[in-house]
Amino acid sequence: MLPDIQSTKGDGEGESLSWVGMEQIDLPIDIAGRPVSAKVNAGINLLSSPEAEKGIHMSRLYLLLDELTQGEITPALLQHVLKAFLVSHQGRSDEASIEISGDLLLSRKSLNSNHSGWKAYPLTLSAELRQSFTVTLKVGIPYSSTCPASAALSRHVAGLQFSKDFGNRIDRLPAAEIADWLVEKGMPATPHSQRSWAWVDIRLNPEAKSLPVLELIDYAEVALGTAVQTVVKRSDEQAFAVANGQNLMFCEDAARRLNNVFRCASFCEAFDIRVEHQESLHPHNAVARIHWKGSKNVT
């Protein structure tokens, strides 16, 4: 018989450990019907006992993780695997967790032209079995943000330039001449905008039967109105410029928009939202966060 060192008595009178397991395990995962090349962290706690073994049997957890590759990930499947973790270490553990990270690739349509392209959304799916079972889903959504203050300053410059070019003729200008001026000189200053990120971290409703990844992304992109594009023709770029002009946002505005949407989402029991505007004006980022736990929030 081969020696089993892990099953020998540990040092320190069997001191308990809050988490023991493996990180960065490669697994092919199906999330929302899409394949994801995932990195998985999996582990359990180790209870204190005078007769406690030195460590856990990681191979048991590793083999059980293969069940996650046999079909689409659901809350029920995650709970089943976590329960199997505890059964595999009966009497030595009463807590288990799984964390799955990867990029979800989605095909997204252009704003105006009849084209589609692929966009990656980073996500982290976490499941814990302690006194109760909980699932959290965190997704990153890239979008564009145009600064309202910069837009106002740009309009002010345009107004000054208009007055300078036309002086006392303003009241008598033909519409066609104004239109020509707007085309050629109507934008002497442009507001600054930047690629931005919304990180939406939700705790799923316990009654959820599936992972609402697509709904989460769609809710966020509709609320923000300026989702980063994939394939872009000129008509799409113009539509994107219009969308940015109609959705001027400070980071505070973006956070509040998302707050309003996810408070009403039936699949969401609580959330932690972080928005990050990667400023083109500054060498630092503008960030806002909002938490909601069902009855109160802290901004």
Curated annotation (Swiss-Prot):
One of its GO terms (molecular function) is GTP cyclohydrolase I activity. The record marks 147 as: May be catalytically important. Keywords: Hydrolase, Plasmid. Pathway: Cofactor biosynthesis; 7,8-dihydroneopterin triphosphate biosynthesis; 7,8-dihydroneopterin triphosphate from GTP: step 1/1. It comes from the Bacteria. Its EC number is 3.5.4.16. GO terms for biological process: tetrahydrofolate biosynthetic process. Coiled coil: none annotated. It catalyses: GTP + H2O = 7,8-dihydroneopterin 3'-triphosphate + formate + H(+). Belongs to the GTP cyclohydrolase IV family. Converts GTP to 7,8-dihydroneopterin triphosphate. This is GTP cyclohydrolase FolE2. It comes from Klebsiella pneumoniae.
